[in-house]
Each structure stands twice: as C-alpha cells, then as structure tokens.
C-alpha cells in the first residue's frame, strides 16, 4: 500500500505446514528516510478470516526490547522482512494486515492490507 514516499508490499506463500509472509518496504522518494523504533518490534502482522476474526498475530506471546533503534532507507532502497505462521488454516479467503512500526518525520504510519487464499 502506498504512503506517498514509501511502499509496503506483502506476499503470502502457502507451504505444506505453514504460511510464510514476505514483506518489503521500499523508499520511492528522492531522499533518505530515517525511521525510529521505540522497541525491538519492527512490524505487526495480523491475519483475519472471512468473518474478520483474528486468527494470528505476530506479536502475541512475544517480548520485545525497550530500546530505541533507527533504520535509514536511502532513496530507492528496500528493507525486506518476513514472518511465518506455523499453521495452515482451513481453506478460504484471509486478510493480512501489516503495520510497519517505524516512525519517520512527515510520514504517516505505513500499513498494507492484502487478501490471500488458503487451498
């Protein structure tokens, strides 16, 4: 999903016993963008079923460091990250919502939503 200067994309891949999510944040601006994080958590990922019931949340039962961190993306640079849902739910249509937790000056929070099929 676009956010003027950065684009967040999601690719959901069904594997035999899990769903893998590959995500990519691309700086499409002409300048470097510095993101600040207040914890070690770089993103949140939530999967919903067709009734909008939450089925998976990346941060559930995880602990993150409480340390400030920075990430600088140069113009044209991409930051790739991933997560694995160690379950294959029943067949159907699901929605994944990813929120990039980094904050940058003059940018809204970066999010993307995408539907995917489980067969």
Swiss-Prot record:
Statement: the UniProt record of this protein carries the keyword Cytoplasm: yes
Entry keywords, A to Z: Cytoplasm, Protease inhibitor, Serine protease inhibitor
GO cellular component: cytoplasm
Disulfide links within the chain: none
GO molecular function (one): serine-type endopeptidase inhibitor activity
InterPro entries in alphabetical order: Intracell_prot_inh_BsuPI, IPI
Localization: Cytoplasm
Main localization, broad class: cytoplasm
Role this protein plays: Directly regulates the major intracellular proteinase (ISP-1) activity in vivo. Inhibits ISP-1 in the early stages of sporulation. It may be then inactivated by a membrane-bound proteinase.
Entry protein name: Intracellular proteinase inhibitor
Organism: Bacillus subtilis (strain 168)
